[in-house]
Amino acid sequence: MDGIKLANVSKFYTVEKESIKVLNGIDLDIPANKITVILGRSGCGKTTLLRLVSGLESFDQGEIIGADSKRKAYVFQEDRLMPWLDVKSNITFGIHKKEIDHNRVDEIIETVGLKKFYNAYPSQLSGGMKQRVSIARAFAYDPDFIMMDEPFSALDYFTREQMQDELLRIHERLKCSILFVTHSIDEALVLGDKIIVLEKGIIKSQYEIEEKSNDRDLLDDKFVKLKKQIIDDLKVI
């Protein structure tokens, strides 16, 4: 499967009759079967870029190649579960009954560690468990690309680390292309095969990480230097 390519993509919003350019001339290759992370501070255009690639919003200039032919799923910051549905029903929600592969769904439920909560309702789940259901729902759709908009940002530190590990394990087992938005440099370094640093609507820098996620030590000199470079890119003091 091929990836997705953005060529000179720009996006404008009109606020009180004033045109504001949110994204400016974005050129980007999003590889298949990898985790590509869009990193930047709040308001830099991360979510807008994700929504353009997913087709939830239209762009004003440029071209996005290869996105229309892809099956895409979306994981939001909020879990967006249906409170009256149990875990399995939430995971299969939105999939046509004839298209549901129950064996695959059961495998995904086991993979995300929710086998014991098969018949549980959202009110009976912790925040981390709810996000596991959201991730499982995305993978159950059998997508080519999963768009993840800061899915772990509302979780506590320890649950967030656990969910990062879970995502890497699921990605390794089920194989899918992921476009992941975050404002956390450490999260980008843990998850990303490719990191896109976005600042004020433009791509400031791009980094590719060769080490497998399980082999990464953020205290290693290489990652310490890379983190410092990204901080410089973002002009964070």
Report each predicted region and the residues it spans.
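A short, proline-enriched helix->beta-strand linker immediately N-terminal to the Walker B motif
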Residues: 140-144
